[in-house]
Protein backbone atom coordinates (compact mmCIF):
# COMPACT_ATOMS: atom_id res chain seq x y z
CA UNK A 1 0.00 0.00 0.00
CA UNK A 2 2.90 2.36 0.74
CA UNK A 3 4.13 1.73 -2.81
CA UNK A 4 0.74 2.86 -4.14
CA UNK A 5 0.92 6.06 -2.06
CA UNK A 6 4.37 6.79 -3.51
CA UNK A 7 3.13 6.18 -7.05
CA UNK A 8 0.10 8.45 -6.49
CA UNK A 9 2.38 11.20 -5.16
CA UNK A 10 4.61 10.82 -8.19
CA UNK A 11 1.52 10.93 -10.44
CA UNK A 12 0.43 14.19 -8.77
CA UNK A 13 3.86 15.83 -9.18
CA UNK A 14 4.03 14.62 -12.79
CA UNK A 15 0.57 16.08 -13.48
CA UNK A 16 1.57 19.45 -12.03
CA UNK A 17 4.68 19.56 -14.21
CA UNK A 18 2.59 18.75 -17.30
CA UNK A 19 -0.12 21.27 -16.47
CA UNK A 20 2.36 24.07 -15.75
CA UNK A 21 4.25 23.25 -18.95
CA UNK A 22 1.05 23.59 -20.97
CA UNK A 23 -0.57 26.44 -19.01
CA UNK A 24 2.29 28.90 -19.45
CA UNK A 25 2.27 28.74 -23.28
CA UNK A 26 -1.52 29.05 -23.13
CA UNK A 27 -1.06 32.29 -21.17
CA UNK A 28 1.42 33.57 -23.76
CA UNK A 29 -0.76 32.65 -26.72
CA UNK A 30 -4.19 33.63 -25.40
CA UNK A 31 -3.62 36.18 -22.64
CA UNK A 32 -0.74 38.14 -24.16
CA UNK A 33 1.60 37.26 -21.29
CA UNK A 34 5.38 37.71 -21.71
CA UNK A 35 7.11 35.37 -24.14
CA UNK A 36 9.79 34.56 -21.54
CA UNK A 37 7.17 32.34 -19.84
CA UNK A 38 7.94 29.82 -22.56
CA UNK A 39 11.30 29.15 -20.87
CA UNK A 40 9.87 27.85 -17.58
CA UNK A 41 7.21 26.06 -19.64
CA UNK A 42 9.92 24.17 -21.52
CA UNK A 43 11.70 23.35 -18.25
CA UNK A 44 8.43 22.12 -16.76
CA UNK A 45 7.70 19.90 -19.77
CA UNK A 46 11.25 18.55 -19.60
CA UNK A 47 10.67 17.77 -15.92
CA UNK A 48 7.38 16.11 -16.85
CA UNK A 49 9.12 13.86 -19.38
CA UNK A 50 11.83 12.96 -16.87
CA UNK A 51 9.27 12.22 -14.14
CA UNK A 52 7.54 9.78 -16.48
CA UNK A 53 10.74 7.72 -16.52
CA UNK A 54 10.56 7.30 -12.73
CA UNK A 55 7.24 5.47 -12.79
CA UNK A 56 7.66 1.73 -12.28
CA UNK A 57 6.09 -0.77 -14.64
CA UNK A 58 4.87 -0.98 -18.20
CA UNK A 59 4.68 2.48 -19.76
CA UNK A 60 1.25 2.06 -21.34
CA UNK A 61 -0.33 0.86 -18.10
CA UNK A 62 1.32 3.63 -16.11
CA UNK A 63 0.19 6.30 -18.60
CA UNK A 64 -3.37 4.97 -18.50
CA UNK A 65 -3.45 5.03 -14.70
CA UNK A 66 -1.73 8.43 -14.60
CA UNK A 67 -4.59 9.85 -16.67
CA UNK A 68 -7.00 9.39 -13.77
CA UNK A 69 -4.80 11.41 -11.42
CA UNK A 70 -4.20 14.01 -14.14
CA UNK A 71 -7.94 14.63 -14.43
CA UNK A 72 -8.25 15.19 -10.67
CA UNK A 73 -5.23 17.51 -10.53
CA UNK A 74 -6.48 19.46 -13.56
CA UNK A 75 -9.81 20.06 -11.81
CA UNK A 76 -8.00 21.24 -8.68
CA UNK A 77 -6.06 23.62 -10.98
CA UNK A 78 -9.36 24.79 -12.48
CA UNK A 79 -10.62 25.64 -9.01
CA UNK A 80 -7.49 27.04 -7.32
CA UNK A 81 -5.70 28.75 -10.25
CA UNK A 82 -8.47 29.57 -12.74
CA UNK A 83 -10.93 30.39 -9.96
CA UNK A 84 -13.68 28.24 -11.46
CA UNK A 85 -15.54 25.97 -9.06
CA UNK A 86 -15.82 22.46 -10.53
CA UNK A 87 -19.37 21.31 -11.20
CA UNK A 88 -20.79 18.10 -9.82
CA UNK A 89 -20.30 16.66 -13.32
CA UNK A 90 -16.62 17.55 -13.13
CA UNK A 91 -16.40 15.83 -9.75
CA UNK A 92 -18.25 12.73 -10.93
CA UNK A 93 -16.02 12.54 -14.01
CA UNK A 94 -12.95 12.85 -11.82
CA UNK A 95 -14.23 10.14 -9.49
CA UNK A 96 -14.80 7.82 -12.45
CA UNK A 97 -11.28 8.57 -13.71
CA UNK A 98 -9.80 7.87 -10.27
CA UNK A 99 -11.80 4.65 -10.06
CA UNK A 100 -10.32 3.62 -13.40
CA UNK A 101 -6.85 4.42 -12.10
CA UNK A 102 -7.50 2.33 -8.99
CA UNK A 103 -8.73 -0.62 -11.05
CA UNK A 104 -5.59 -0.49 -13.18
CA UNK A 105 -3.16 -0.01 -10.29
CA UNK A 106 -4.75 -2.46 -7.86
CA UNK A 107 -5.30 -5.36 -10.24
CA UNK A 108 -4.24 -8.71 -8.80
CA UNK A 109 -0.81 -10.06 -9.70
CA UNK A 110 0.14 -6.92 -11.56
CA UNK A 111 3.71 -6.03 -12.35
CA UNK A 112 2.86 -2.34 -11.90
UniProtKB/Swiss-Prot annotation:
SUPFAM superfamilies: Multidrug resistance efflux transporter EmrE. Coiled coil: none annotated. The chain crosses the membrane at residues 7-27, 34-54, 59-79, 89-109. It is a multi-pass membrane protein. It is found in: Cell inner membrane. InterPro entries: UPF0060 (IPR003844). GO terms for cellular component: plasma membrane. Pfam families: UPF0060. Keywords: Cell inner membrane, Cell membrane, Membrane, Transmembrane, Transmembrane helix. Belongs to the UPF0060 family. HAMAP family: UPF0060 (MF_00010). NCBIfam families: PRK02237.1. This is UPF0060 membrane protein Daro_2632. It comes from Dechloromonas aromatica (strain RCB).
Amino acid sequence: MLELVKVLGLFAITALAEIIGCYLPWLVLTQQRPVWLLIPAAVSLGLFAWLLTLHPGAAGRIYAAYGGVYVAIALIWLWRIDGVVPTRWDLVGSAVSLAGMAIIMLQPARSV
